[in-house]
From Swiss-Prot:
One of its GO terms (molecular function) is pyridoxal phosphate binding. CDD domains: SHMT (cd00378). Keywords: Amino-acid biosynthesis, Cytoplasm, One-carbon metabolism, Pyridoxal phosphate, Transferase. One of its GO terms (biological process) is glycine biosynthetic process from serine. It catalyses: (6R)-5,10-methylene-5,6,7,8-tetrahydrofolate + glycine + H2O = (6S)-5,6,7,8-tetrahydrofolate + L-serine. PANTHER family: SERINE HYDROXYMETHYLTRANSFERASE, SERINE HYDROXYMETHYLTRANSFERASE 1. Disulfide bonds: none annotated. Pathway: One-carbon metabolism; tetrahydrofolate interconversion; Amino-acid biosynthesis; glycine biosynthesis; glycine from L-serine: step 1/1. This is Serine hydroxymethyltransferase. One of its GO terms (cellular component) is cytosol. It comes from Streptococcus equi subsp. zooepidemicus (strain H70). Belongs to the SHMT family. Homodimer.
Length: 419
């Protein structure tokens, strides 16, 4: 029976309305969640292609199904572009997410029950770096390293001392809420001192690495994992990289057949488009603008003694702010800013004293507003609007003023719609 529902707007009105509402939200909200970005229409078109119909267990030229000659071309393009982008000898573009990429890296390098040294979640790490509620913390014996209490930056001497004490089989470098450059060469030195593997999760900074604006972990890590969205500005998905042939075989086997079945070739096609975009010199300009916008926004908070900028600043696409002098906690700050169409997230800060469901801080990222074309001036304006809303959170008329200014900004920098 042939389809008679070619237009989903007519066929599924409820779904269409929900998607239209989300499109409107994205158009008229200022997006500051550090793990989010805005993809190009080319990326969306590739992801919405007929490749969604094709099952392709295995890898290019080694499939378990027929009719894969064209998806082999697509996946090979994505692999070669990823290798070129990050200077890696081997790449796997099949992980459905960054979490699955991390799971595959663990499977490739260590065994269940082995000791792993990873960044503590409260210090800026990720759930998959050993949180007890996550598969990583349930499967492996994670020990968390943190930041220096005074500087709130990584203390490599302290991490080396801790590594010598716990003798991990694997050290995980990388973060989801750390605003400073990470020295991967130092991490490799530490790993070598204790005979451990080094895994780098560069999910948040992959776009900055691709642009040459952050040290590339590929020459230092045994395995590098990443997402393909965030600063890389591709579809939601994962990526694995290595320069070691033996490890490449293990990581590929960990993804398939270890963790996944058929790859999502339509998403892989979108990854290929995003990698091509990131190879364009214009992407470096974009990444530079992300860093400049983030620094400009952070500076506004740094100059206001009602707020505390964690670690005193930022080197990348994000920063953390302690908001407890002006509002009870980060959860309330997040909810309040949602009301004025500014989207960000509550976030624990180093040595957090509040519940992770409340937190003392908020996390702010500038990748998405930069994709809209906003610059340093707009970034400073947004910072002032956030401060105005938080300081006056019990004054509805002022919150309405902020909401109006947010709408003026988003109208001036449309995302997909044209004014």
């Amino acid at each position: 029976m042939m389809f008679n529902n070619e237009n989903y707007k007519d066929y599924d009105q409820e779904l269409w309305e929900a998607i239209q509402a989300e499109e409107d939200r994205q158009e008229h909200n200022i997006e500051l969640i550090a793990s989010e970005n805005m993809v190009s229409k080319a990326v969306m078109q590739a992801q919405g292609s007929v490749l969604t119909n094709k099952y392709a267990e295995g890898y290019p030229s080694k499939r378990y199904y027929g009719g894969t000659e064209y998806v082999d071309i697509v996946e090979s393009l994505a692999i070669e572009r990823a290798k070129k982008l990050f200077g890696a000898a081997y790449a796997n573009v099949q992980p459905h997410s960054g979490s699955q990429a991390n799971a595959a890296a663990y499977m490739a390098l260590i065994n269940a029950g082995d000791t792993v040294l990873g960044m503590d979640l409260a210090a800026g790490g990720h759930l998959t770096h050993g949180s007890p509620v996550n598969f990583s913390g349930k499967t492996y014996q994670f020990v968390g390293y943190t930041v220096d209490k005074e500087t709130e930056k990584l203390d490599y001497a302290a991490i080396l001392k801790q590594a010598k004490a716990v003798q991990p089989k694997l050290i995980v470098a990388g973060a989801s809420a750390y605003s400073r450059q990470i020295d991967f060469e130092q991490f490799r030195f530490i790993a070598d001192q204790v005979g451990a593997y080094l895994m780098v999760d560069m999910a948040h900074i992959a776009g900055l690495v691709a642009a040459g604006l952050h040290q590339n972990p590929v020459p230092y890590a045994h395995i590098v994992t990443s997402t393909t969205h965030k600063t890389l500005r591709g579809p939601r998905g994962g990526l694995l990289l290595t320069n070691d042939e033996a490890i490449a075989r293990k990581m590929n086997a960990a993804i398939f057949p270890g963790l996944q079945g058929g790859p999502l070739e339509h998403v892989i096609a979108a990854k290929a488009v995003a990698f091509k975009e990131a190879l364009d010199p214009a992407f470096t300009d974009y990444a530079r603008a992300v860093i400049a916008n983030t620094a400009a926004m952070a500076e506004v908070f740094a100059k206001d003694d009602r707020f505390r900028l964690i670690s005193g600043g930022t080197d990348n696409h994000l920063f953390l702010v302690d908001v407890t002098k002006v509002i009870e906690n980060g959860k309330l700050a997040q909810a309040l800013l949602d009301e004025v169409n500014i989207t960000l997230n509550k976030n624990a800060i180093p040595f957090e004293t509040l519940s992770p469901f409340k937190t003392s801080g908020i996390r702010i990222g500038c990748a998405a507003i930069t994709s809209r074309g906003m610059g340093v001036d707009e970034s400073r304006t947004i910072a002032h609007l956030i401060i105005k809303a938080l300081v006056n959170h019990q004054q509805p008329e002022i919150l309405e003023e902020v909401r109006y200014e947010v709408r003026r900004l988003t109208d001036a920098f449309p995302l997909y719609k044209k004014n």
